[in-house]
């Protein structure tokens, strides 16, 4: 309560000053005011005390964290100085780890920042963009023209279009059945015409996560194409509606007896339990021929180990060769035994090295009446979950050379029209797929392209079990990021778009189906302003690469009915 001032007395006069001082003195002498001041002063001290204690605690916490960080840094530095494996770390403790960090994220940095649209490998940015946009159902067109130096490019494909092409197929038309009926030439009980020329190649559960395999199987069911199980066997992740090609590897996973050897009864039982349309015997793989399959220890979880019958947490290495047969003759006995027990078409998958095996195989097929129903040629540039670099880079012929040589062996033996040929090894792009079909492929198997569709970012960590996209991993945390239902839709969209663009290319060449496009329509640039037809480059004779006359006529009828229906 202040001392009242005279309203008439101007502020700042001597009298007003005396009255203000008297008011202050009165406040000091007043007991109530003194008590109020003491209470306020206590509160101030209490607040200041709380603030000081909080500050002390914060300082102590920061000091503890700092000491902990310092201890960790010193421990790492000590380890770096004492270890003997890495010279960089011995010479530059702590900061030397930056080198390994940059090395670890190098693929991602190059992918998004450094490289051009066409130079990255194994799939360039342009190729990945086409795959991704096809999967999303987005615009797959590119503007402004090609990025490629066409005239200076060596081994560059040019498609010779027809002057009077067929009408452009409607956007919704993408049905492309196989030109041949699988198993018909050998009279198998369960012959069938594969409904799609584009199918998903062998990628086993274990190498891929269960959610990834489920997404692929669901997508195949939607797209009406075949899903190869891979050598890991038929698992619960393969039972979501997609029709299957059951692969038998050298480890015989899923069809082995207690002794680890092949069990025909077990195979027949497994094949009858799911929509298996064909059985593929894996002789070798393009990325690592001469070696068996390798599943890194990080991927051998308890579930994978139980399905394969192998120890948990240890590298699962398949033998380099089969124990059920040892040459072409015993292989054909093995094939015929499986076909008799299951009624299914049976074929082989192989990389291409020596041609002697193929010559012996075709001789026996011609002379004995035994034979394979299909042959899958896997190019040396094909994918793998894990392989030695020397094998991936230098063992086995690339697809186009290998395919043309094997096809030539079958053609000279008069058997090319009786066998369905499938190809794999970076064929999931329209131009590569058309090239393969002109060389005689009836089916195109896509592998890494399918992985890109369901989330792969080409991080190239498949062999570590730490795939960041949840595709090639067994980590539950990483795999949970992959939603099978949505990724299945993307796979179906990708397959449909690839078939549609293949159909567009065929129509541009004046043919209703890509299986009818021959090597005469393809030219290969030599990088020196010259070109040669693929017929000459690969030594093809007239009619090679085409189905039989009867199959061609039937295929034209099928495509004609599809065109009318559209």
What are these model-derived regions, one by one?
Residues 317-479:
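Glycine-rich phosphate/ribose-binding loops and adjacent secondary-structure elements
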Residues 273-275, 280-282, 286-308, 460-477, ...:
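Mobile "lid/hinge" segments at catalytic clefts and subdomain interfaces of large enzymes
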Residues 1-52:
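Intrinsic low-complexity, intrinsically disordered coil/linker regions enriched in small/polar
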Residues 428-431, 437-543, 548-561:
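Gly/Ser/Thr/Ala-enriched C-terminal appendages of enzymes
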Residues 230-232, 344-349, 372, 416, ...:
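Flexible, glycine/charged-enriched surface loops at secondary-structure junctions
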Residues 246, 254, 297-326, 385-400, ...:
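Glycine-rich tight-turn/loop motif centered on a GG-T
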Residues 57-221, 225-228, 232-242, 246-258, ...:
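Conserved, well-structured core domains of diverse proteins
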